[in-house]
C-alpha cells in the first residue's frame, strides 16, 4: 500500500517542512481512502505566515499596479498549464464531477486575468471641495496584510477570489484552505513558487479553523 503524500505549508517564499507530530488525513469522499496528509497547523504557524506577509507588503505595494498585474497573469498562465492536474485534484478530494471541476479551474484563471485588467483602472480621485478654489486629491493605499479562510465547496476559485484583488491593490495575503480540500491549494502554491512571486506576498498555511484559522481571523 502506498503511503499518502505529506504536504508542507508555504511560508515566506518556501515550502516549510512540518516539525510537529500531528497530521490531518485528507479523504476521498467517494472511496473513503486517505489520499494525502496535511500538518495540523497551529496559531504559531499562522503567525509566522502573517509576519512574512507583513515584511513583504511595503515593497510589494511600492510596485506599480501594472507590474503587480503582470504577476497575476503569470499565475493564471500557470493554472492553465496545469488545468488537468488541478481539476483531477478537485474531483479526488472534493467529490465534484469532472466537468464542474474543469469549469472551476478555467473560471479561476479567467478571474485572475480579469482582476489584472483593473490595474489600468485602479486610480485616485480629484474631488471638488466645499470651499471655492479648492480640490481634494484622494490617493488609494493598501490595507496591508489580508487573510483568506476558505470553505471546501469551491476551494480553488476562492483562492483567487481572495488573492487577486488583494495583490492587485498592493496587499499581501495568507490563505488557509479547508482541511477537507487542501490539495488543490498546494498545487496553487507550487505555481506561485514556480513563477518566482516575491517571497512573503502569498503564503499558505494548513490546519484546522479553530487553531490556525482563529489566528488569521
Regions found by a protein language model. Name each.
Residues 124-217:
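Rossmann-like NAD(P) dinucleotide-binding subdomain of oxidoreductase/dehydrogenase enzymes
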Residues 1-38, 70, 74, 124-147:
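Terminal low-complexity tails and localization/encapsulation signals of metabolic enzymes
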Residues 25, 37, 89, 100, ...:
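Conserved beta-strand positions that form and line the central face of beta-propeller blades
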Residues 10-11, 25-28, 34-47, 196-201, ...:
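Histidine- and aromatic-rich ligand-binding microenvironments
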Amino acid at each position: 500500500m502506498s503511503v499518502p503524500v505529506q504536504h508542507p505549508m508555504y511560508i515566506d517564499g518556501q515550502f516549510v517542512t512540518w516539525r510537529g507530530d500531528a497530521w490531518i488525513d485528507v479523504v476521498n469522499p467517494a472511496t473513503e481512502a486517505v489520499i494525502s496528509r496535511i500538518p495540523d497547523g497551529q496559531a504559531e504557524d499562522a503567525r509566522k505566515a502573517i509576519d512574512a506577509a507583513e515584511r513583504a507588503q511595503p515593497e510589494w505595494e511600492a510596485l506599480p499596479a501594472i507590474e503587480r498585474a503582470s504577476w497575476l497573469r503569470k499565475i493564471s498562465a500557470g493554472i492553465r498549464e496545469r488545468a488537468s492536474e488541478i481539476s483531477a485534484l478537485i474531483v479526488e478530494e472534493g467529490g465534484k464531477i469532472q466537468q464542474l471541476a474543469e469549469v472551476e479551474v478555467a473560471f479561476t484563471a479567467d478571474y485572475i486575468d480579469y482582476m489584472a485588467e483593473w490595474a489600468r483602472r485602479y486610480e485616485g480621485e480629484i474631488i471638488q471641495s466645499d470651499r471655492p478654489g479648492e480640490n481634494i486629491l484622494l490617493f488609494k493605499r493598501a490595507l496591508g496584510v489580508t487573510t483568506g479562510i476558505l470553505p471546501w465547496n469551491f476551494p480553488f476559485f476562492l483562492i483567487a477570489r481572495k488573492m487577486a484583488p488583494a495583490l492587485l491593490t498592493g496587499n499581501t495575503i495568507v490563505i488557509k484552505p479547508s482541511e477537507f480540500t487542501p490539495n488543490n491549494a498546494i498545487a496553487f502554491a507550487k505555481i506561485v513558487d514556480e513563477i518566482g512571486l516575491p517571497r512573503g506576498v502569498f503564503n499558505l498555511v494548513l490546519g484546522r479553523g479553530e487553531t490556525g484559522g482563529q489566528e488569521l481571523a
